[in-house]
Regions:
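Ribonuclease/tRNase effector modules and their secretory precursors
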Residues: 1-86
Length: 86
């Protein structure tokens, strides 16, 4: 896959114990994406161990985005992940 945008990570995204590398992995290689607001996206993916991770990405424009929330996916999102894979 090719990505032509830049994705950064805000320090606040790491407060739930997800590493920066795993937050970026889940946000870049997401399985499900949903628009939360005009400039915010919920992205559901997996960390390097295969655990489901939820991220919120702020779209800044000009191809730039920032992950500002990352945590182990809550149960309410699990169905979205597994429904998408089948």
């Amino acid at each position: 896959m090719y990505y032509d945008n830049e994705l950064g990570i805000h320090a606040s995204a790491l407060k739930h114990g997800v590493s920066a590398a795993d937050a970026l992995l889940a946000a870049i290689q997401y399985i499900v994406i949903a628009e939360l607001a005009e400039d915010r996206e919920l992205r559901l993916g997996f960390d390097s161990s295969g655990k489901p991770i939820e991220t919120v990405v702020i779209v800044l424009g000009s191809g730039r985005s920032v992950v500002n929330h990352a945590m182990p996916a809550r149960r309410k999102f699990w169905a979205l992940l597994y429904r998408r894979q089948t």
